[in-house]
From Swiss-Prot:
Alphabetic keyword roster: Ribonucleoprotein, Ribosomal protein
Family under the similarity heading: Belongs to the universal ribosomal protein uS2 family.
Chain residue ranges for the region called Disordered: 233-255
Keyword hit for Nucleotide-binding: no
Organism: Macrococcus caseolyticus (strain JCSC5402)
A GO cellular component entry from the record: cytosolic small ribosomal subunit
Source species taxonomy: Bacteria, Bacillati, Bacillota, Bacilli, Bacillales
Pfam families per the UniProt record, alphabetical: Ribosomal_S2
Protein name, entry field: Small ribosomal subunit protein uS2
Length: 255
């Protein structure tokens, strides 16, 4: 049985690409035709590519790996959060902070700050601090939860990235490539497919299309994991992300 059907793709509007004047020639092999100034994506190829991506993500999950879901454009934010959480994975759906992967030592301090401020509220520290200081602490807390809440429990380098719109997420892609983290991505007709290891040619602007495809990647993780929890995965890996980043960065420099 196919991972996804042509009917599902058509109903979600996956086949609608960008205007013909806004395209990347490298996407030509994934384009079926042009209609009213808009490129139509070849859904037969999308079906095949979804299956390839699904099997790859499933294999990662079977081995106890993790996937970082990244989608900060408005059309992707909700689906990225919901599907990553459903699959017990990590996500960034507001803004990619520079160094999220390549400089995790600094990022981890900000993540740790979330817990520190929570503890201050729980142990009564807020009650003895000036009201102005408490307001500032709450603002700081809200900021870090907004940008980093989705990777709060990420203790090791993700096994792969899943991104919606490589043009929008170019910084995330650059960091992943530097650290040799494979990338699965929803790639529209205006994007460069060469940046992505597992290309899913599809409309990256329609909420239904993004939801459908992101959901399929979450399904792959759940099928592969078969009940293994994030806590068990983290315990099995037992790797500190900041240390792993340093090792990979050194390997890249030496190469």
């Amino acid at each position: 049985m196919a991972v996804i059907s042509m009917k599902q793709l058509l109903e979600a509007g996956v086949h609608f690409g960008h205007q013909t004047r806004r395209w990347n020639p490298k996407m030509k092999k994934y384009i079926f035709t042009e209609r009213n100034g808009i490129y139509i994506i070849d859904l037969q190829k999308t079906v095949k590519k979804v299956e390839e991506a699904y099997n790859f993500v499933k294999s990662i999950s079977e081995e106890g790996g993790t996937v970082l879901f990244v989608g900060t454009k408005k059309q992707a934010q909700e689906a990225i959060k919901e599907e990553a959480e459903r699959a017990g994975q990590f996500f960034i759906n507001e803004r990619w902070l520079g160094g999220t992967l390549t400089n995790y030592k600094t990022i981890s301090k900000r993540v740790k700050r979330i817990s520190e401020i929570e503890k201050m509220e729980e142990d009564g520290t807020f009650d003895v601090l000036p009201k102005k200081e408490v307001v500032e602490l709450k603002k700081e807390y809200d900021r870090w939860v907004k940008f980093l809440g989705g990777i709060r429990e990420m203790k090791s380098m993700p096994s792969a990235l899943f991104v919606v719109d490589p043009r929008k997420e170019r910084n995330a892609i650059a960091e992943a490539k530097k650290l040799h983290v494979p990338i699965v991505g929803i790639v529209d007709t205006n994007c460069d497919p060469d940046e992505i290891d597992y290309v899913i040619p599809a409309n990256d602007d329609a909420i239904r299309a993004v939801k459908l495809l992101t959901g399929k990647m979450a399904d792959a993780i759940l099928e592969g994991r078969q009940g293994v929890s994030n806590e068990e995965v983290a315990a099995e890996q037992n790797i500190d992300l900041s240390e792993e980043t340093e090792v990979k960065a050194e390997e890249t420099t030496e190469a």
